[in-house]
Amino acid sequence: MLTKPIQEEEKIYKNSSLGSYWITTFGCQMNKADSERMAGTLEKMGYSRAIDELKADLVLYNTCTIRDSAQQKVYSFLGKQVKRKHSTPKLKLVVAGCLAQQEGESLLRRVPELDLIMGPQHVNNLENLLERVDLGNQVVATEETFISEDITNPRRDSSICGWVNIIYGCNERCSYCVVPSVRGKEQSRYPDAIKSEIESLAHNNFKEVTLLGQNIDAYGRDLPGTTKEGRKENSLTDLLYFIHDVEGIKRIRFSTSHPKYFSKRLINACYELDKVCEHFHIPFQSGNNEILRLMARGYTIEKYKRIIENIRQLMPNASITADAIVAFPGETETQYRETLKLISDIGFDQVMTAAYSPRPNTPAAFWDNQIPEEVKKERLKEINELVETTSRKRNQRYLNNIESVLIEGLNPKNNAQMMGRTRTNRLTFVEISKNIEFNYSYGDEINVKITEARSFSLSGQIYK
């Protein structure tokens, strides 16, 4: 029997009087964490979680604007709710996140049926903003603000693995990226507040935490204090040591890293600290130094390769994942081929790929040397095929190995299988054998013998 723990949040928010809510989240892990926090606020206010988006009394879209396709998807979703609003005037429509920040009042002109538009920095102020809506106002909250600590318990989508934001915003100015203009300047949370949230997760039987930041290696640069060696007193490395002793937490992850700031000291900490998983997500974006310079990334391919070498020197079986952009303005066929070569040479476990998409208020969007759409599609197709092949080849190293898998639940497509992840973040499906006594709970770590390795997942059997 597979048992699931009950979270305290589920006990607290039983009585609801304000109707139901629905949240759809687009984009990154930061958005997912923000959505969990907003869901917690809504349930604290008295809303209950709807089971049908088209019957919810409050609909919130937490949006992404990193690519145009994500932006257009939001407008498509909004169209359905606008029709509902005309027949159900009491319906509250909220657009949060990066698109809300980017468009501001112009979004209200495009979709006048909206009740609330709020940028990412206002996530912790949702209750006050909705109170203004209840007074009959249409509210636009996109002004830059200090992100205060929120004492609301997030409504977690998982009962085992929790997202914990440790730094908001980004001070980098990559020429293609809209994030700094929509998420604002870097704001680090204090270590005590982060540890307190992780302790709360442990109290609620969570077993894994993922520390989040748009540029997580920048954590602590804006906090006071320096050591006698002259470095900042608070860094991601220091934070990992600080939270490592939280009882009940078995695994710690962090994302997303920037090669410009990824240090040997951090690598050493990951090697020394047992709970920190051997999984590193470090975007490289391009395999060509000239393109990296035009992107304003602040590092070279040679430096990136040294980082990977340093990781693998201490942790040979570590999982390395990355992001890559193809068809950046001016990218030649030769430069593009260097990106393919880098993927083959390093042997990534996985690479998240995208064709360049011009974003508002970014330098690269105004350059004349944009790549034709048909070339973008060809390059994206080719790189994706390479990534799939490379990932499948890389995953063969797990075959017949005994891997520790943290159980997250049942496979929604096959209830005869559990699913979980290895320390290296490989999604793993585990057969529930009828011939073996089975008595595990969500959050248990079990030994699994890997019997099948695909490009992006593994399968195996319980090993006793």
Curated annotation (Swiss-Prot):
Subunit structure: Monomer.
Cofactor: binding details: Binds 2 [4Fe-4S] clusters. One cluster is coordinated with 3 cysteines and an exchangeable S-adenosyl-L-methionine.
Main location: cytoplasm
Organism from which the protein derives: Prochlorococcus marinus subsp. pastoris (strain CCMP1986 / NIES-2087 / MED4)
InterPro entries referenced in this protein's UniProt entry, alphabetically: Elp3/MiaA/NifB-like_rSAM, Methylthiotransferase, Methylthiotransferase_CS, Methylthiotransferase_N, Methylthiotransferase_N_sf, MiaB_methiolase, rSAM, rSAM_horseshoe
Alphabetic keyword roster: 4Fe-4S, Cytoplasm, Iron, Iron-sulfur, Metal-binding, S-adenosyl-L-methionine, Transferase, tRNA processing
Function, in words: Catalyzes the methylthiolation of N6-(dimethylallyl)adenosine (i(6)A), leading to the formation of 2-methylthio-N6-(dimethylallyl)adenosine (ms(2)i(6)A) at position 37 in tRNAs that read codons beginning with uridine.
TRAM domain segment(s): 396-464
Cofactors named for this entry: [4Fe-4S] cluster
Annotated GO biological process: tRNA methylthiolation
Disulfide bonds, paired cysteine numbers: none
Binding site for [4Fe-4S] cluster 2: 170, 174, 177
Protein's cellular compartments: Cytoplasm
Any single Gene Ontology cellular-component annotation: cytoplasm
Residues bound to [4Fe-4S] cluster 1: 28, 64, 98
Similarity comment: Belongs to the methylthiotransferase family. MiaB subfamily.
Every Radical SAM core domain range: 156-393
Enzyme Commission no: 2.8.4.3
Gene3D superfamilies documented for this protein: Methylthiotransferase, N-terminal domain, tm_1862 like domain
Gene name per UniProt: miaB
Matches recorded under Pfam families: Radical_SAM, TRAM, UPF0004
Protein name: tRNA-2-methylthio-N(6)-dimethylallyladenosine synthase
MF term (GO), any: methylthiotransferase activity
Domain MTTase N-terminal: 19-135
